Amino acid sequence: MQSRLSRAVGSFTCVFIVLSGVSVAVGPASRADPSDYARPPVPLPVITPTPSDWVPKFPFPFDQTKNRVTDADINAEREMCQWFNAQYDELMRQINRLQFNRITPNGPGVYMGSGSDWDYSIGDLQQQVDIVTTNIDQSVSFLAPRAQALTRSTDHAGNVYFPIYQGESFYLLWQHLSNVNAGIKSHQAAWFTGPSVHRVLRWGSRIHRSNVCE
């Protein structure tokens, strides 16, 4: 009886961890049709940057580092914003739905040997994984050279910072998105990849709330 209770508690905990990631992702769109969230993943188009009239913002204290922002910084963030506006929300919807689907093929919870979570052979789970990881690969490949092109400076205390507004957010979003992809591809448990998903959501939320891409 005690072992059954322990398994039940463990299952509830795992479901809660994954669903908590989902709630962060879809919070702003809570009034949307729930069936929209459950849509199967589809391949996302390759982003081709186009000319735009976007310019960076310099709220305090970034007005103090404006002189350190280069043309390369501006071009990199302009193009990353085009990706963010076009695909970030949909990509995170796909990731969160996949995380949810990974723990539910055999009912709520993850049981050792149940064929869920780390086993992608249930139903069309492998197909979902292939589509989502390909989309993440594509996004990471797009972000990598641009995030790496951002200027990083050091202040008087030896701390590294990005002179351009939200440069750090884009850089860390790229890093953690790469970690999410590696975790899914290596069949890591949903609870193990969950922290990286939450970090992507954190930095994506910061970018969104800053209005830097408007």
Name each region found by the language model.
Residues M1-D33:
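Secretory targeting and sorting signals
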Residues D33-L44:
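Cleaved targeting-peptide boundary
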Residues I74-C81, Y111-V129:
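Second-shell loop/turn segments in exported
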Residues P43-Y111, T154-E214:
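C-terminal amphipathic alpha-helix
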Residues F16, S20, Y88, Q138, ...:
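Prokaryotic Sec-type signal peptides and long signal-anchor helices
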Residues D119, G123-F170:
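Short, solvent-exposed, charged loop/turn and helix-capping segments
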